[in-house]
Amino acid sequence: MKATLEKIAELQKAGIIERFAIGGGIAHFYYIEAGTTYDLDVMVTMNAQASTIFSLEPLYEWAKKSGYIVSEEHIIIEGIPVQFLPSFNATITEAIEQADLVEIFGVKTFIMKPEYLMVIMLDTYRAKDRERLIKFFTQSGYSTTLFEALVAKFNLVEKLKEFKAKYYGH
């Protein structure tokens, strides 16, 4: 994992990606009890060009030049399947911009704050997201104030009410 994180940092230094933050299962396990995950999800903003069409092509070109295998949506970097996900909405963009600088395996990297992960899980609402969201409410040291502000900002108040009614009876 250390070598993988170092390569991702190099992508930013080289200007291939503008900003990034670890999200998905690996980010979740930074804050809550570990479970299983297959890959490393890296949310990215790319350096803007004249086109408004978002493309991960520079990442795939880098992978090819660097001798890394591309397998479906993953680039296998130093043995770790990495899925680069574009910043496709305001929530993800803000989560990347507000990410915390942390040290993992001796490498400085960016990871999404727990409140943003929680809002993203509430928004996507897959079964594994709901399960992890319950763990976040009970295991992570998140800011209730920030979480509630983000829920309101990203129009998820009703969804949170439904979630709480279903899983907590209120």
Where in the sequence are the language-model features?
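Compositionally biased terminal segments of proteins
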Residues: 1-170
